[in-house]
From Swiss-Prot:
Keywords for the protein's UniProt record, in alphabetical order: Acetylation, Calcium, Metal-binding, Muscle protein, Repeat
Molecular function GO terms recorded: calcium ion binding
Source superkingdom: Eukaryota
Taxonomic lineage from the root: Eukaryota, Metazoa, Spiralia, Lophotrochozoa, Annelida
Residues the record lists as binding Ca(2+) 1: 16, 18, 20, 27
UniProt modified residues of type N-acetylserine: 1
Record: residues binding Ca(2+) 2: 104, 106, 108, 110, 115
SUPFAM superfamilies in the cross-refs: EF-hand (SSF47473)
Further comment: The sarcoplasmic calcium-binding proteins are abundant in the muscle of arthropods, mollusks, annelids, and protochordates.
Name by which UniProt lists this protein: Sarcoplasmic calcium-binding protein
UniProt function note: Like parvalbumins, SCPs seem to be more abundant in fast contracting muscles, but no functional relationship can be established from this distribution.
InterPro entries assigned to the protein according to its UniProt record, in alphabetical order: EF-hand-dom_pair (IPR011992), EF_Hand_1_Ca_BS (IPR018247), EF_hand_dom (IPR002048), EH_dom (IPR000261)
Binding of Ca(2+) 3, residues: 138, 140, 142, 149
Length: 174
């Protein structure tokens, strides 16, 4: 659907950190560096964050890239093929706990509104956009995102061809 393509373009736009038209390992490194700086995290946490975010590239996207950067068309076409595969859900969900760990800066196994705002800042978005996305994902309305809520919302973002509240998982659609 057009909505699904728009969601994939949104994800690509958020992850193409240097806006050079391709997703590369450098985008994930830059994201980790900005996040560590914005959240003023300790050096050991910054290392875990770097490992988590570069792990998304190393473990999941490098196969699509074939050792190079991934342009938007290649990314969208790869995702189209992936979501048709019944086993794709585990591949799509694989990086989500890594992102969760990156966003859960105080390591309490929940993401707070403030942490989600930092996440939006890390993606280069206005932090004031975060509450609407946070509320859409916080299905039990307890003011915290659990790993389960985060993974379900992230998986739905990629796998659901229709409209859902999780379409704003990575912020407003581009």
């Amino acid at each position: 659907s057009d909505l699904w393509v728009q969601k994939m373009k949104t994800y690509f736009n958020r992850i193409d950190f240097d806006k050079d038209g391709a997703i590369t390992r450098m985008d994930f490194e830059s994201m980790a560096e900005r996040f560590a700086k914005e959240s003023e995290m300790k050096a050991e946490h910054a290392k875990v964050l770097m490992d988590s975010l570069t792990g998304v590239w190393d473990n999941f996207l490098t196969a699509v890239a074939g050792g190079k950067g991934i342009d938007e068309t290649t990314f969208i076409n790869s995702m189209k093929e992936m979501v048709k595969n019944p086993e794709a859900k585990s591949v799509v969900e694989g990086p989500l706990p890594l992102f969760f760990r990156a966003v859960d800066t105080n390591e309490d196994n929940n993401i707070s509104r403030d942490e989600y705002g930092i996440f939006f800042g890390m993606l280069g978005l206005d932090k004031t956009m975060a509450p609407a996305s946070f509320d859409a994902i916080d299905t039990n309305n307890d003011g915290l995102l659990s790993l389960e809520e985060f993974v379900i919302a992230g998986s739905d973002f990629f796998m659901n061809d229709g409209d859902s509240t999780n379409k704003v998982f990575w912020g407003p659609l581009v």
